[in-house]
């Protein structure tokens, strides 16, 4: 892909998806390789801090400083709100899903329960998470639907169809707030 883009005088930014230590993730970033990776280590620490009331912000601060120590202040790592392998942030923030349930159980939950957002505070939590991701070093990456609070448990429930219209008031409000953060 990069060779073709170089011949045409264009640059293609390539970001990877690797779970593991900072060293493992960094090993795929180099000239002729990936430009960046999703920062899952930061995401996995940010998720409970923003989704729950009980988590300590120091945990997030430590994870952010570890990310900066490994990738530098001016890096291209992806600050994600979620991805296709994880349940949706808003379903954690809503309290529908918890952090104690085994990861593979979320797949069954997605098939057997109608996961919807019940707690409107979850939209505010997601807005704060967006603001955090857009103001720290790296590139903010919003998983489709997270701009308005699409719920979901495990795969395939977290891959619901994107809604482009007829959003609920609180979904439209979050979408507008997210749009404001971007512009």
What is each of the regions a protein language model found here?
Residues 126-128:
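Conserved interdomain hinge at the start of the Helicase C-terminal
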Residues 1-80, 132, 149-180:
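Active-site-proximal helices and loops of the catalytic beta/alpha 8
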Residues 116-117:
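Short, solvent-exposed helix-loop connector elements
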Residues 29, 79-111, 130-172:
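Aromatic/acidic polysaccharide-binding cleft in carbohydrate-active enzymes
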């Amino acid at each position: 892909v990069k060779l073709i883009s170089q011949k045409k005088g264009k640059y293609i930014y390539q970001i990877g998806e690797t779970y593991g230590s900072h060293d493992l993730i960094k090993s795929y970033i180099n000239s002729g390789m990936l430009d960046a990776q999703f920062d899952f280590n930061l995401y996995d620490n940010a998720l409970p801090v923003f989704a729950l009331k009980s988590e300590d912000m120091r945990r997030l601060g430590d994870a952010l400083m570890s990310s900066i120590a490994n990738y530098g202040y001016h890096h291209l790592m992806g600050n994600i709100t979620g991805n296709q392998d994880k349940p949706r942030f808003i379903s954690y923030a809503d309290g529908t899903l918890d952090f104690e349930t085994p990861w593979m159980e979320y797949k069954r939950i997605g098939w057997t329960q109608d996961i919807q957002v019940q707690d409107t505070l979850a939209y505010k939590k997601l807005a704060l998470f967006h603001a955090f991701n857009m103001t720290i070093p790296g590139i903010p990456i919003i998983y489709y639907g997270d701009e308005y609070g699409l719920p979901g448990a495990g795969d395939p429930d977290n891959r619901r169809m994107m809604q482009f219209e007829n959003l609920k008031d609180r979904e439209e409000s979050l979408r507008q707030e997210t749009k404001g953060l971007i512009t």
